[in-house]
Amino acid sequence: MADSSSSLHPLCERISHKSYVLRAVDLTILGLLYSLLLYRILHISENDNVWLLAFFCESCFSLVWLIFTCLKWSPAEDIPYINTLNERVHDLPSLDMFVPTADTVRESPIITVNTVLSLLAVNYPANKLACYVSDDGCSPLTYFSLKEASKFVKIWAPFCKKYNVRVRAPFRYFLNPLVATDDSVFSKDWKMMKREYVKLCRKVEDATGDSHWLDADDDFEAFSNTKPNDHSTIVKVVWENKGGVGDEKEVPHLVYISREKRPNYLHHYKTGAMNFLLRVSGLMTNAPYTLNVDCDMYANEPDVVRQAMCVFLQNSKNSNHCAFVQFPQKFYDSYTNELAVLQSILGRGVAGIQGPFYIGTGCFHTRRVMYGLSSDDLEDNGNISQVATREFLAEDSLVRKYGNSKELVKSVVDALQRKSNPQKSLANLIEAAQEVGHCHYEYQTSWGNLGWMYDSVAEDINTSVGIHLRGWTSSFISPDPPAFIGSTPTLGLEAIVQQRRWATGAIEVLFNKQSPFMGMFHGKIKFRQRLAYFWALMCLRSIPELIYCLLPAYCLLHDSALFPKGPCLCTIVTLVGMHCLYSLWQFMSLGFSVQSWYVVQSLWRIIATSSWLFSIQDIILKLLGISQIGFVIAKKTIPETKSVYESKPSQGEDDVPKLNLGKFEFDSSGLFIPGTFIMLVNLAALAGYLVRLQRSSCSHGGGGSGLAEACGCILVVMLFLPFLKGLFEHGKYSIPLSTLSKAAFLTVLFVFFCVGK
């Protein structure tokens, strides 16, 4: 409850980041793009079909920049004031935390354990928290790991709170050696904690290779004769906070769940697991707010829950319409600098409109909104209107929407009416929780239209569109240090496959019933917010990106002109130079190096001509009914923690492990053929150009192709440098012969086509 007599200082404040200088730069680049288009239109009759292709590509790039400029026009973010929250709010609301995992091979249990430990140790009343771990692979190893983690957290959570530890994921905290200190008690506790964590890691590692413990413990009987895609519902209360005394009261509820899966039933991948988490948590604790994080995304800021509550508890009409609070994804490894920059720019941009997208992790949701409420269903005081009461709370409507579980229906009514459930023993609710996990439970209900949305492998964007279409807003908080930090796949197939899934899911959203296109005719989504979701269509840029990467080579081989001659060439030079300097400044302003900027520019081109290109193929095959789109789990890893007796060079607490920046891993997947083909074509064109220069240093030939086109080829080769390096590397960093031979065959065909014309 808030103290009305306290200061009127807000719990959070929306800060605008408008910059007239950046607006001027954006508009200047846009003006240069359209001046180039105008030049091509005026001179199109003097040139061949190459100019038509160039005009098409540059029109697409201009449209993308126009939309991006609109989205960046009024950037903003919410700044929470935790001290004000601590002063004014004495009875904090409850929170249910969701951690989904699905594959113990690609998502190691110790990764999930670290995420869970970081959540259980946040600075928030333990009796107000509950952590639910969904295991879609029904692995006894995951359950075993959580049982061991529940023992460790009883000493870990008190240790973190006693010494105000900031990074509460043990693997990350213990990467650094013990700093010399005069506090002998802390040193003793630190060494003891690290020993216990190393023991925990060894137990999980030993259990991975030896399953004898499965037969020795009756608690694992439910896992006998189970398969990842064929098993019954399992709900296990790993730890229940019953108050108690001492350190035990510092540990929130911890529940393991695995929904029923059968081969002949749709299970909707991660989206179905999230809806099961929503139902089970509604039955057991029914907190008004939920948090979901991926199993590798640990809480890096112990006050993150309080930061989100500053937005939800802000006493204003506008905050009553905030459906979710989204924190940006930040990573400690690999190639994801481009995500950090994109989220910083696009996240703040849409925060100034209707709010950021839900990005699938690091997000706090309002339970009532996930149950299907629209913003118009609420009165100014936050209560449900009479019209909405008749619509939502009628008995037949409740069963039709939420299923035939009486216990769940009652919990839904309580959540919609903002009633707190009386505390019950979690063990007494296991049977009801198992019921809502049956694979047929959602049949002929509204699940998938409420909760997390189905019909797309990108459940985050799909759900986000549905929420904004109902008139809700969302909040963007980007604290320093980051609230959540995770790992990503290494550069190569894992990264490209992940980007392919994201791109495919984004395009799916634009063709299903939650499409922002439909929001033009119904729904309460703002125009610029629709443009933000149309940004998902940038995946379609793969076609003009591919064409534009080949055009300079085509012109050199065909002896024709791609770029204007004389003074008009300055437009393109200015445009390219200005865009490069602008993007470089954006990277460096966020603390990234020039090398990181170059790697990201290269990666964008590789993703555009591989992941995005194949995502279009996936969508076409789905629309034709030829194949369905699967959900591919990216493999995640964390650095190994050494024992307390092993030494390591000292590094600051904020240091993070760095992978080989820009080092690309290849295999025989067809995803690498386009990039290899582009690189070989441009090398062939440059070789032909050099031969022609030797033969005639004074003439470029009839069409006038020359230095500008050669510079274009050099730029493309620089952007696809990982593929050039792959020709000379060994092992996993080398392009396989099968991929190279296919790309070489396509290159020969392309060269003959150009020369023949």
UniProtKB/Swiss-Prot annotation:
Disulfide bonds: none annotated. It is a multi-pass membrane protein. The active site is at 136, 460. It holds the Pfam family Cellulose_synt. Expressed in young seedlings, primarily in the vascular tissue. Expressed in the root cap. It is an enzyme of class 2 (transferase). Signal peptide: none annotated. GO terms for molecular function: cellulose synthase (UDP-forming) activity. The keyword Transmembrane applies. The keyword Cell wall biogenesis/degradation applies. Keywords: Cell wall biogenesis/degradation, Glycosyltransferase, Golgi apparatus, Membrane, Transferase, Transmembrane, Transmembrane helix. Its EC number is 2.4.1.-. GO terms for biological process: cell wall organization; cellulose biosynthetic process; root hair elongation. GO terms for cellular component: Golgi membrane. The chain crosses the membrane at residues 24-44, 50-70, 531-551, 572-592, 613-633, 671-691, 704-724, 735-755. InterPro entries: Cellulose_synth (IPR005150), Nucleotide-diphossugar_trans (IPR029044). Thought to be a Golgi-localized beta-glycan synthase that polymerize the backbones of noncellulosic polysaccharides (hemicelluloses) of plant cell wall. This is Cellulose synthase-like protein B5. It comes from Arabidopsis thaliana (Mouse-ear cress). The lineage of its organism: Eukaryota, Viridiplantae, Streptophyta, Embryophyta, Tracheophyta. The gene is CSLB5.
